[in-house]
């Protein structure tokens, strides 16, 4: 589906995320449509964006939500931006199903 902010790859998925640091809680809040029409997975973390802490918290949040090891989740692009591209390694079909369930709950 083109309206989803993730794309399956040979060894996992790539997810476009809009992160709100210092968001008051750690949560994934579903899919948001940006002004340019692109879909992003909206997430927030409690920590401030200093020394990569918000990126680490985001990776842990996604790993916990998908029930996978944190080492499977990395920031592929946008390390210093609110808009990030997250790489998740694993079975692509399983990850896409889990992301769809996660987005519906958000």
Regions found by a protein language model. Name each.
Residues 1-51, 55-59, 64, 70, ...:
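Contiguous, often N-terminal, cationic amphipathic patches that form binding interfaces
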